[in-house]
């Protein structure tokens, strides 16, 4: 009996031992399987986000790197590869009333005026007579157009006084001297038309055009060379006329039109050869298109004229009075749309751009441009 009981206990102990061994093996297998899963998880996390330990996690509604950053597929923010550099300073717009104006300026034409001196006085002016103020952004880009022939002496004085004045006015501008080639009869208005087109060829952003005789110098820098809602007449009080407007419709000397205003009147007439008449024709064009003349205060719009004799081949135009009477008809076909000329040379000088052109002669269409 005892022998039978001992055999039974031995078999039970062996069975328990086998069960314990089986349980141990199952536990070991499960342990290594869980360990492998954890190792794979942390390996993937380390590859995707190597810099995670250096940057704290951000909430889903906040991005601390840059406004356009996006979250990764794991829900964690992506770390930028490089931080953005400093932004360029914003240049403010130029004020309506420039702070550096001096008002009335003493003008004299007795001292010698070499171009080298004028160039030294205006170091900020770039080749071709271009200037942009460094401390503000102007609202307009201004082209100053000068009809010209054989007036080098006058031009030096004009540049001497005008460059500093235009810089004080905080203008972005360029100076264009339109030089009529040859000795045919002078045609001021046609040269101004040429200047309008040639300036736009160089810089299509020009939106204001100042047309100035080379012998007229403003006496007050508060006479701002800008364009407004209406065509502007600047030279309203010349010493030549006793500092008074000679007549109500006078539009001579120095005037300004925006690009849109100039095109609205079909530019200036091309058929006024010789002295006189074209200014009155331009006034008629402005009136006929429903615009009005804007002028500065008479105390500000004062000018000095450099005295000179009448130019050869610029005699008074005997047809000017009859032409003025027909502006309503002639402005439709005579103007910027019918302009013909030929550019002979473009020379960019330190203080201005010289454009020499062949504009033909009276009753001639030989200049095909």
From Swiss-Prot:
Kindly list the cofactors needed.
Answer: Mn(2+)
Which superkingdom heads the taxonomic lineage of this protein's source? Eukaryota
In the UniProt record, does the keyword Oxidoreductase occur? no
Q: Detail which positions bind Mn(2+).
A: 215, 308
Q: What is its EC number?
A: 2.4.1.-, 2.4.1.38, 2.4.1.22, 2.4.1.90
Keywords associated with the record: Disulfide bond, Glycoprotein, Glycosyltransferase, Golgi apparatus, Manganese, Membrane, Metal-binding, Signal-anchor, Transferase, Transmembrane, Transmembrane helix
Q: Does the keyword section mention Disulfide bond?
A: yes
Please give the positions of the paired cysteines in each disulfide bond. Answer: 94-136, 208-227
Q: Which residues bind N-acetyl-D-glucosamine?
A: 277-280, 320
Per UniProt, UDP-alpha-D-galactose binds at: 147-151, 186-188, 214-215, 275, 308-310
Describe its membrane topology: Single-pass type II membrane protein
Q: Which residues lie on this side of the membrane: Lumenal?
A: 37-369
Q: Which GO terms describe its biological process?
A: carbohydrate metabolic process; cerebellar Purkinje cell layer development; locomotory behavior; memory; protein glycosylation; visual learning
InterPro entries tied to this protein:
Galactosyl_T, Galactosyl_T_C, Galactosyl_T_N, Nucleotide-diphossugar_trans
Q: Where in the cell is it found?
A: Golgi apparatus, Golgi stack membrane
| Regions of this protein lying in the Cytoplasmic compartment | 1-15
Name of one Pfam family that matches: Glyco_transf_7C
Record's family?
Answer: Belongs to the glycosyltransferase 7 family.
As for what it does, the entry says: Responsible for the synthesis of complex-type N-linked oligosaccharides in many glycoproteins as well as the carbohydrate moieties of glycolipids. Can produce lactose.
The protein's name in its UniProt record: Beta-1,4-galactosyltransferase 2
Q: Which organism is it from?
A: Cricetulus griseus
């Amino acid at each position: 009996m005892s022998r039978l009981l001992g055999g039974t206990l031995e078999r039970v102990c062996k069975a328990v031992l086998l069960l314990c061994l089986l349980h141990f093996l199952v536990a070991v297998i499960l342990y290594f399987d869980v360990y492998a899963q954890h190792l794979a998880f942390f390996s993937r996390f380390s590859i995707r986000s190597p810099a995670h330990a250096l940057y704290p996690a951000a909430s889903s509604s906040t991005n601390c790197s840059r406004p356009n950053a996006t979250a990764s597929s794991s829900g964690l923010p992506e770390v930028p590869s490089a931080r953005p550099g400093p932004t360029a300073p914003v240049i403010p717009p130029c004020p309506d009333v420039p702070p550096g104006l001096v008002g009335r300026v003493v003008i004299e034409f007795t001292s010698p005026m070499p171009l080298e001196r004028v160039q030294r006085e205006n170091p900020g002016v770039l080749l071709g007579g271009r200037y942009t103020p460094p401390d503000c952004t102007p609202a307009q880009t201004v082209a100053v157009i000068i009809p010209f022939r054989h007036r080098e002496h006058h031009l030096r004085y004009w540049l001497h006084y005008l460059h500093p004045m235009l810089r004080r006015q905080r203008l972005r501008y360029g100076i264009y001297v339109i030089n009529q080639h040859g000795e045919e009869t002078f045609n001021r208005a046609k040269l101004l038309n040429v200047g309008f087109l040639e300036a736009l060829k160089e810089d299509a952003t020009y939106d204001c055009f100042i047309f100035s005789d080379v012998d007229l110098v403003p006496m007050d820098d508060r006479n701002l060379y800008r364009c407004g809602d209406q065509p502007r007449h600047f030279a309203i009080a010349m010493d030549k006329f006793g500092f008074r407007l000679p007549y109500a419709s006078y539009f001579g000397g120095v005037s300004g039109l925006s690009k849109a205003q100039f095109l609205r009147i079909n530019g200036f007439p091309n058929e006024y050869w010789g002295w006189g008449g074209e200014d009155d024709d331009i006034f008629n064009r402005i009136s006929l298109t429903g615009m009005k003349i804007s002028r500065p205060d008479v105390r500000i719009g004062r000018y000095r004229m450099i005295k000179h004799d009448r130019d050869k081949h610029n005699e008074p135009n005997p047809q000017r009075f009859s032409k003025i009477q027909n502006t309503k008809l002639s402005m439709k076909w005579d103007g910027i749309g019918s302009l013909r000329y030929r550019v002979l040379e473009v020379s960019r000088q330190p203080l201005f751009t010289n454009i020499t052109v062949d504009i033909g002669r009276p009753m001639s269409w030989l200049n095909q441009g």
